[in-house]
Amino acid sequence: VDAGTMNPIEHGEVFVTADGMECDQDVGNYERFLDEDIPAENYMTSGSVYLAVIQRERNLEYGGKCVEVVPHIPQEVIHRLERAAKKARADFVLVEIGGTVGEYQNILFLEAARMMRLAHPRDVLFVLVSYLPVPEMIGEMKTKPTQYAVRSMNAAGIQPDIIIARSTIAMDEPRKRKLALLCNLSERDVISAPDVQSIY
């Protein structure tokens, strides 16, 4: 439900927001980077989403309807995103769906994203941040993991609009062209993001 009971050896240190939400350390990194407090409603876990849906069902808030994983769990995710945006009076909302595309843990969040794009096609943009390894013994950047990530997203009904290609080195033009072609994007929508000394 929250990060307070997670094993820090497996999940990293617990970060507590100013309003008391126990979450993972990524939120602390985001707060430092943005130099802003991030309120509790900007963080959700699968457990907290499931718990909210179950509690509403127990309180008869679904009017006796059969409550199902789909669509009710993705609808709860969408409801929370919209509520957080409204409360913050946000011009836009940047949402990180953690994990790796294709993992079962994030499939319902991807379904929520797909449903949002379907409902608001001009207001939803998908950005895939993908790692392009450079095996030391070969010294050549590999694009296959990113190609498979895009295929997995496509299988979930999502086509990324932008790919941010993370790597130890900058991506060259031939690989950029290859990724654009094989991932159904224009070259300008494939962005190289090599490691740097400081992100500030």
PLM region spans:
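Flexible phosphate-sensing "switch/lid" loops adjacent to ATP/NTP-binding sites
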Residues: 1-200
